[in-house]
């Protein structure tokens, strides 16, 4: 596999209750690249994202993470998952732990980081997103935008090589979307490899290196944002963009 490819999907298929949700997806995600996946509801975007770290196991096809086929049964998937941060639509913070504990439990238990070092790194990340003063707050005391910023830096505490975002702003009030997108833009500027499922077309235009359009489980079009939005080739994509732009 090309040294510059972080993740490769080959012929990925997935069905639920006999209905094909992914129908042979091929996609290369290069190191340091931001790939944004868009498409209508039910097109398979989130399922595909969850296949990339095997939260959903493909029925057919392969997922390569660096040079390892992580769809192989003998692979220790937990070892590879630690290198892929994932941010969900509904934050998935532990409600009974304060923010600092939410952030340090992973590094302490999985990376064997000493408590003091884990807390120091967590506080530096909280400082970076302007939430150091909320270290001892609980998730229920935070706004949606604050929770999602915490969810992002919590994932970063594990020092991932890739970040996967599953509609990170869709559960937020409109005025909170910008603060979360800003954190993601900052990550992109630092050349973090990112795969983002989103409805935020402005983010896709501004930040993506590649934009991918999925519809009915099929990768219909993939291109750089200026071509993808400015000169779409696929008729279904033209129709979709006409409704959302």
Which residues does each predicted region cover?
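ABC family nucleotide-binding domain
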Residues: 4-225
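C-terminal boundary and immediately downstream tail of ABC-type ATPase nucleotide-binding domains
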Residues: 215, 222, 226-245
